[in-house]
Structure formats: C-alpha cells, structure tokens
Amino acid sequence: MTMGYPGTTSRYLSSYGVEERMNADNMARIDVRAIKQAIWKDAMEKSDAVRIKYASKYAQSANYWKNSIGMNQSIKKLNIIGKKRRLEHQLTEWIHRKPEERNKYAGILTELEDSYRNRYKNARAMAYFGECFANGPELVTAAWSVLNFDFEAEKSVLEERVRQLLELYANIDLDIDKKVFVAMLKEYAAVVEPESLSETYATIEKKFKGDYQAYVDDLYSHTELDTPRGFERVVKKDSTYVLFEDPAISFVIDMLVKSYELSAAADDDNMKIEKNERLLNEAVREMESDKDFYPDANSTMRFSFGMIGGYSPKDALEYTYYTTTKGIFDKIREYKGDSDFEVMPSVIDLLENRD
C-alpha cells in the first residue's frame, strides 16, 4: 500500500483538450527543458561546485520534463485520443436519441472543437512563454521576486521570503544563466508567431542587430539584480537606484505585458471551454449512469494498494520489479560516460567480489 499526494489529474478531459495538453503544454515543457537542462548538465559535469549548486534544481526540472515525455508516449501508445473520440461519438448519438437532452447538451462537442482550435496558437505561445521565461533564466526569477516582494508581510513570512531569495542568489552561476537566457530567447522566437513576441525582441533587433548574446551581455552588465545588491538597495531605499529603470525589471514587465495580451486574447474561448468541458463531463455521467466515476486527483492525500510486480512498457520488453548485479553492470557498459549511470569504483569492487 502507498500513501501520498499525487498532484492533479484530468482524466475526463475531452479529446480536444488532450490534444492541446499533448501538443502545447507537454511539448513546450519537453522542448524547452531539454535545452535548459543540457546547458546545466554540461556545466555540472565540468565542475563539482556547479554540480552541487545545480543538482537539486536540475532534478526538479527533470521531474516534470520526464513526466511530460512519458505522458505523451502513453497518450499515443494507449490511443487515448482515439478512445475519447469514440466515446464522444457515442455521446453525440445518445444526445440525438434523447429529445429532452438536446437543448442542454447539443453542440457542446462542436463548440469545444472550435474553441480549442481558436485558442491553440495562444495556448501554445503561453506554454512556451512560461517555460522559456517564467521558468527559464534565474535572473528573471530573481527580478520577479524583488518586484513582487511584500515588505508589509508578517515578520516570519518576511524572513522566509528573504531566505528564499538569498538562497536563489547563492545558487546562480551567472555565466550559465546567460547561456540559458540566450537559448530561451532563441527558442521562443523560433517556435511562436511573430505577433507573440514582446517588445524586447524589437529592441534586440533594432539596438543589437538581432544578436541575442549581445543583448543578454548588456542586460547582465547593467542590472543590479544579478546579485543581492539590488535587493539590498531596495531595502535601504537607496535614492540613487530606481528599481523600475533596472533592465531586468524592464524585461520582466515587458514579458508580463505580453503574457496578459496572450491570455486576454483567449478569454472568450477559455470561458467556452470551461463551460463545455463541465457539460461534457455531466453528459457522459448521465449516459453511463451505471458506471463508477473516480474523482480526479486534487493534491490531497490518496491511498493505493495492490501487488508489487514488473511491467512491460512495449512488445517483447519486460521489466522486473527488482535490480540485479548483472543489470547494474549492463547499464554501466551501455551508458559509459553518462554521469547518471556512474557507479563508485568501491561499489563496483564490492559487486565484483560478491561482497
């Protein structure tokens, strides 16, 4: 039996919602984090100091990156979209056979399809935007934290937020962060429509001739927020430092403006989707009234129980539930040079000697 907090699930989402989750949200996370983590990992393998700084945040980033990869693989393998389409077709026929349900449920699937299609570009842009900038360079995270710092909070809350901010700064390597910043700017510009670009991109084109590296170097050389000194000047109310003139803050504000624009453009479709997803769920429950519907996870504690066993991820491949010495040596040979599969020499000696 296991006990834990499973986050959230969306098991009753429409086929159109699953498509969007797969192609917008998940793909953004897969693409962008692969780029960011590759930069981090390269630096971590070259320096123990960097590895120690970045190990925890690399693991946190990789967690939902792997989750998104696995989710997309499972959606395809299990034909989730096809199964949902069949259910939705059955629902359409059921609605047509029941005159009393037509006024309530007729058209919900057509509206869902139209609304998801209408908002797709914005949803995809928002997904990449969040991964590239809100979850990208740590300078942006620091600047956002300073911009939103609540100096009127209770003392205990204030102390905790100061601690978190100083910990963030303590674990930033600015050279690595610059590489991430440049990569994020490039990736976002490469995958979205021109109208989804913020004014920062026009500045880069005009002032820096499209050179992302030059823009990032200039930003880091002029901001006070690349270290705690900018925050200290805000706390001390240094009259010679104007927070809103700091280039990192200017970048954050520009990103916020574009984020709100993208979000507002999808408001009508968002409301239609929320309404019709709810009606779809209600209609399916009426159609299959003799079936048990388990609730979605909502971050509250859950219990699960069953038998421990292996699994078969694909045809002709079997995984047991335990690890063998042979399996460890096979992985060492197969992934030679990959730090994720390195084993300490002393442990290898013990295994070889069957100690």
Which sequence ranges carry the predicted segments?
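Terminal presequence/propeptide segments associated with secretion/organelle targeting
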Residues: M1-D355
